[in-house]
């Protein structure tokens, strides 16, 4: 039953329920209460004697009967599906006690005898009345009803034998509580009042007309019609299909009501459900409709039955009224109606009276009890209603509990999911935190990059502005140069006209020579006649005089060998002198004629030689073709006639061999003649080259002398003008020329550097270098002289390095010709043409691609003058130990044979400069002695180039240009060596001796004072000036030009980075000293020129490593002992540049130290192992030779000696290895000692500079103190100035402290910044210095800051930045006036503290450089990364190792 449905009192299905219950009781009751009683009597005649007894017995019997059947019927009434029968409840399972399936039984005790209290204790006259109730109810006070759960067990005892019922289906609650009472039954003592009521309700009989009304008021049915129909349908629908067969429904109703199949009601229902008798299945809606219709039909039949019952009752009353005893008739009629037999005995009247009296009394009692029961029933109905409501509430709570349980399960699942999601969220949070940290780091790095980019952007903007200015300057300069070019073109036109005139004169002279030769022939014929006459006259005396004429005749009758003629022509004077001394009576006419003849015998003209050469080659080709044809015809004839003429074959073969041998001898003779032609031509060319070199040297000497004189005059005039001009004008004018020079250098450098690298990559292998190139270059020397003079006039600021390069190159070329092979004439002419056709600005690639024919006839590219630059003796990288090694054969021979020609260093051109930028071309200059005073030549040439500018009325610019050139002169050599190192590693790996030789030669080169404006190309590092005999003079010659321009020193690193620099300010009292230094320098340069001319013919010497080291130490000593009047003198700058170079060099050394150590150890071990294996193999071979030479004692002795020699060789090898390692360690120790010396000197220089600047600061502060006190009272003005102080400080520090990169473009250059003492800045500092709170973070201004790549960003109070401000800066004005002595004492303390800090920092740096742990180099699996390291780092450090280490 659904919880929400409320019971109705008048339910149309009540009749069906009552019928079903009555039928169940009728079947279950064994002793039916409706059995007809059998009255027993003592005799048949007197039936009234036992009536009382029989009635009492019957009442007792029906009262004391146990209620088993009632329990069974109660069990059967629980659900319609329960099977009827007394045993249906015995085997049912027991269910747990739950509020859902709990069923309560309401027990009512009805007693006939005694009071209510007696009935409670007496079981004889009372019988329990039980009905099922599934709703608990509170017990009333009269204790008429007991509520006993249906789930009580069997152990309750025999008196209350209540058995467990069948558990109802969950969700189906049957409320079977039916309260029934019989208030109209006269037999009140019967124990089944409800059964009587139900039978009457079925229409089986009623005694009174008031029964239906009372019955409808008393009975309450709680079963709903629809719920009952649903229950029946669900019971029949066992498979839960939603449809039930009609036969199942009819069988269920038949079985439940125990009716037969012929019952009219079931038959009618079957017809209604299945009219066609096909046993169809119907759904729930159809079932409901038909069943409701059938129930209505049954109700209508029930009304008819009630009417029939009333009619029968009236008839019965009539019959009873006719008889005497209504009771008897009533009893009889009742018994007959139930099918019993009427008693035949005649009862006595007295007994009947007694019975009637008892019955009336009992009836009254029962009526009272019925009234009480009605009241109890009403109370129970109210209670039942309350219980129903409470039950509904409990069911709603149960449903809510179930929902809560489901919700709890869902919540648990959600909690598990939340835990999983929480763990995942924790992981994601950890990942997000890691990502956030990573993003923060990246953000910081990006911020730093953005800041760096902003700084770079500012620098680029500044550079762009500067470049714009430089472009404007260059435009002006270009205009001037164009004017000069036009003037030079006019000069060239004049010179070409002169050359043409000279050519005409030469032609005339040739014609005259021809005429003279004809005259000489005539004279020789006369001479022959005279000789013949003399022989006839004096035959004995004329024999000695015949030698010359005989030689002449032999020369005439010879095979025309040019070599023999040239050999005789080279020593004509000696022969003539010998003849003149030995044959004193020879005539002067003979001597003159013989001299002319010998001169004419020097050979035919080049045109004749070329014609003979061509004719000889054509003849050889023709003979070759003829020989080939004859050979082929002979072979063909032999093959054709081999079958027929076998006998003549041998003869023909011999004849052919003879012919071929003759032809071969002819060819050999012709080839020998060609060799003679070539040799004679080579000698002639060599002679011409030597003559031309001599003439060029004389021209250069004269030009140098003239230029030096003009330069000296111009410098003297400049000195006088400079002394007359005031100081401020000099400062203003000293800013521009350096700037202009810097523009020229920066714009010229990269293009030349590119040309240099391109030439290196395009150069052919070393084996293709031919000796003919040097000879032909000597032929081109006159053309080079003209081009060099022209270029000098165009570019007056060109310095010594270009001239020195081309001269050293040409000299090395001339030297190399003495031990080289010979070449033909045609390739020489082609090479000459390829050089002379090149214009001044011709690119390097064009000159490289000019073809010429080589020795073997193949065509190969005509290389420029740089071919000699690739010689291994000059380009080998520096060995790790810098050992001294002797020069190879080429160097020694060239050095011994060739005279000194350093005066040739002047001339060059742009083309030659581009072609000779390889640094090894400079190394050729090492072949000559450094004692020739070459640095002075460089100074004089620089002065001569200054003179050209001075003539245009620009003395100030010329002076500054000279200073820039001299300062660049000091930093050139190391950069060139770096270029050699970085590029030679790419091309070739050289033997150890050549590598060891490279460094001392390079050190000697730097003594030549090489300088070039192309600082990008050649590097901006200081060179270590070395010398053999006069190293001190060389150092002085380098110092003096730099002292001349020390006021205008600028930072090469700053110029590299396009940072504008301003010359430092010098006091006026030092100007006379500078002028005297300049004058002294000019005088020394003139002396050096004369000394160079005197030493021109001296023999060159090769300086070894020890000499180079000695010169380095002597130079350092001279620098350290130099006068300290200027703290930034050239020696200090050199030391500082050397310090930076060494520091970076040590860093790079440590970068590859461990890798190189392992490689060297591995190579050493491999070499020793190889030597050991060779010795072992030699011993094995000797052991194999011993059995074969046992008989020969001399051989055995030799073998034993060889074995002893092998043992000695092994020992010597071990000794050599150990000694070489010791020597390398000593070399390294020497290098470290020099480095420490340089660093100590650098520290001393820094200390002196700091002391000097600190003294200047103290002096400036004392001068500014009175002015500061005058402003002490204006506090508001101080506040205003202090607000502006930060921006001014930022601007000033930005303008001063310019930090260069860690590896700038010119490492090792000067890192001093010379700042001007601007009056506006000084005034701002003086006015804003009084802030007491802001002074702690402010530095006193310095005129110079020393910042390197390592220390640029350190903001410590060391000497690399500015000294710490004194305590007086922080004191208020009132205290400053009162304690000057105390502040000075504290100042001294601070000075010493700063000095100690600087020394500690430098010592720590030195220790880190010396003891730094080794770091592996870049991966060397492929060559790219190693080459990248070399290209980036080593060109700036001067390091030269053995190239890329082997894998």
From Swiss-Prot:
Membrane topology reported for the UniProt record: Single-pass type IV membrane protein
Transmembrane segments: 1389-1409
Coiled-coil positions: 354-518, 665-731
Gene Ontology biological process terms from the UniProt entry: mitotic spindle organization; mRNA transport; positive regulation of chromosome segregation; pronuclear fusion; pronuclear migration
Cytoplasmic side: 1-1388
Residue spans of biased composition, Polar residues class: 71-92, 1021-1035, 1110-1119, 1359-1371
Domain of life: Eukaryota
Region Necessary for spindle and spindle pole localization, annotated ranges: 1076-1265
Parts of the chain on the Lumenal side: 1410-1447
Keyword Lipid metabolism among UniProt keywords: no
Keyword field contains Transferase: no
Database matches in InterPro entries: KASH5_coiled-coil (IPR028168), KASH5_EF-hand-like_dom (IPR039508), MRVI1 (IPR008677)
GO cellular component labels: centrosome; chromatin; endoplasmic reticulum membrane; mitotic spindle; mitotic spindle pole; nuclear membrane
Keywords (A to Z) from UniProt: Chromosome, Coiled coil, Cytoplasm, Cytoskeleton, Endoplasmic reticulum, Fertilization, Membrane, Nucleus, Transmembrane, Transmembrane helix
Comp. bias regions, Low complexity: 420-436
Subcellular localization: Endoplasmic reticulum membrane; Nucleus envelope; Cytoplasm, Cytoskeleton, Microtubule organizing center, Centrosome; Cytoplasm, Cytoskeleton, Spindle pole
Region feature (Necessary for nuclear membrane localization): 1388-1447
Family: Belongs to the IRAG2 family.
Disease connection: Defects in irag2 are a cause of pronuclear congression/fusion and chromosomal segregation abnormalities in the zygote named futile cycle (fue), a lethal recessive maternal-effect mutant. Mutant embryos undergo several cycles of anucleate cleavage and die.
Function of the molecule: A maternally expressed membrane and cytoskeletal linker protein, which is essential for attachment of the centrosome to the male pronucleus. Promotes male and female pronucleus congression and subsequent fusion after fertilization. Congression is mediated by the sperm aster microtubules.
Protein name: Inositol 1,4,5-triphosphate receptor associated 2
Gene (name only): irag2
